[in-house]
Amino acid sequence: MNIQRITIETSSDAVQAAGAFYRDALGLAEHVAVRAASEPSSGFRGFAPSLIFVQPGDVDAAVERALAAGAKVIKPVAKSLWGYGGSFLAPDGTAWQIASANKTATAPATGEVERLVLLLGVDSVKASKRFYQEQGLTAAKSFPSYVEFDSGDVKLALYKRASLAKQVGIDPSGSGSHRLAVVAGGTFTDPDGYAWLTAESTVHAG
């Protein structure tokens, strides 16, 4: 089962602006849609998409566009053990990670996205892994604290909620709706309340 796109929910008066942000600042019109939220939400929503570029220069350029469009820095971009990256809060309140595996440029920046990963913060990685395998997903990487599935253009990954919040640099507390719907080949709700749909009415980021 492949993920076709993710749908982020926001207040009805911010749908068009949020769609423009993902389209113009991040270039994600194909894989991110936006719709009006129907349930309240506060604090950390439990998930964090991760946008991975090939070159660190693309990380800098994307962050610059995001901040100019109203995003707020959570972690400034910097070199780390894993590469080069940081995190920011989108205008709709979604926490994003942005990174490159390359700490220094190996070629000129081109804007090439290597992959988009949807990181879900879960209560039990083991239980959630089993649940998603029962839905037909295949684990491509599997560790006690992290699992990544082969799910098409948008990769699905599982991480403990508190660990994900720490990695992003945000307070783990939060309540209410996740304000997220995953559009794929099945309709279900996972053990942590993340909704999956086969089709829906959305306003696309494109």
Model-derived features: where do they sit?
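Glyoxalase I/VOC metalloenzyme domain signal
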Residues: 1-74, 89-143, 150-206
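RNA-recognition motif
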Residues: 77-79
